[in-house]
Curated annotation (Swiss-Prot):
PROSITE patterns according to UniProt: FLAGELLA_BB_ROD
Entry protein name: Flagellar basal-body rod protein FlgG
PANTHER family: FLAGELLAR BASAL-BODY ROD PROTEIN FLGG, FLAGELLAR PROTEIN
One term under GO cellular component: bacterial-type flagellum basal body, distal rod
Transmembrane spans: none
InterPro entries from the UniProt entry: Flag_bb_rod_N, Flagellar_basal_body_rod_CS, Flagellar_FlgE/F/G, Flg_bb/hook_C_dom, FlgE/F/G-like, FlgG_G_neg, LlgE_F_G-like_D1
Chief location: other
Keywords: Bacterial flagellum
Species: Salmonella typhimurium (strain LT2 / SGSC1412 / ATCC 700720)
Subcellular location per the Swiss-Prot or TrEMBL entry: Bacterial flagellum basal body
Subunit structure: The basal body constitutes a major portion of the flagellar organelle and consists of four rings (L,P,S, and M) mounted on a central rod. The rod consists of about 26 subunits of FlgG in the distal portion, and FlgB, FlgC and FlgF are thought to build up the proximal portion of the rod with about 6 subunits each.
Length: 260
């Protein structure tokens, strides 16, 4: 019976982790480009009392054996990179990705990070940057006298300048894809970094080699479904209550033993 206390405790810990993941999803329901997570669990080691297939007598063998589980543990938080909705902003510097791929940005230490958040801005040097101030790569400089900015589905960035009828190309927005998006590491600020599990980054022109297309004047919203998360929350609450009941029931059984 002491084992059942610890087994139920692992269930409580697992459901608390599940609840933390759901709460984080709901907290980021309005975060541009956010991808929801899902907690993944696995059962713990088993106490084998009778090996399956062992002989029970000279003539017979056990068909199933006797194994007692020791609980559950969280093994991963899987990020689901499904497409979010495109929300129109009519801001010429906002760009949404429809399909696969990430924008590449430069971190302060010179390394690269990746994001789905295309709510870009222009800094004091005319550089195209994220809302957090990270420079888009390859670098794109918007002239100070630019009257308008046009970003094509293929990532070509052009500006219209005073005194010039034809637009002038000032840069190219590329997309980076990975063999395993789920293997990317989240570092906050809507950014991911490459890991061994994600595979090497592959930079492509939007619309080529499996990369998505760009939509100017839109941002990609979070792919969190509030109704689905609330249903998951109810399931977690019930599972937590059941494990709590297992703890209290075991405690009552132990009390009965001590009264004998």
């Amino acid at each position: 019976m002491i084992s059942s206390l610890w087994i139920a405790k692992t269930g409580l810990d697992a459901q608390q982790t599940n609840m933390d993941v759901i709460a984080n999803n709901l907290a980021n329901v309005s975060t541009n480009g956010f991808k929801r997570q899902r907690a993944v669990f696995e059962d713990l080691l088993y106490q084998t009392i009778r090996q399956p297939g062992a002989q029970s007598s000279e003539q017979t063998t056990l068909p199933s054996g006797l194994q007692i589980g020791t609980g559950v543990r969280p093994v991963a938080t899987e990020r689901l990179h499904s497409q979010g909705n495109l929300s129109q902003t009519n801001n010429s510097k906002d760009v949404a990705i429809k399909g696969q791929g990430f924008f590449q940005v430069m971190l302060p230490d010179g390394t690269s990070a990746y994001t789905r958040d295309g709510s870009f801005q222009v800094d004091q040097n005319g550089q195209l940057v994220t809302a957090g101030g990270f420079q888009v790569q390859p670098a794109i400089t918007i002239p100070a006298n630019a009257l308008s900015i046009t970003i094509g589905r293929d990532g070509v960035v052009s500006v219209t300048q005073q005194g010039q009828a034809a637009p002038v190309q000032v840069g190219q927005l590329n997309l980076t894809t990975f063999m395993n998006d789920t293997g990317l590491e989240s570092i906050g600020e809507n950014l991911y970094i490459e890991t061994q599990s994600s595979g090497a980054p592959n930079e492509s022109t939007p619309g080529l080699n499996g990369a998505g297309l760009l939509y100017q004047g839109y941002v990609e919203t979070s792919n969190v479904n509030v109704a689905e998360e609330l249903v998951n929350m109810i399931q977690v609450q019930r599972a937590y209550e059941i494990n709590s009941k297992a703890v209290s029931t075991t405690d009552q059984m132990l009390q009965k033993l001590t009264q004998l």
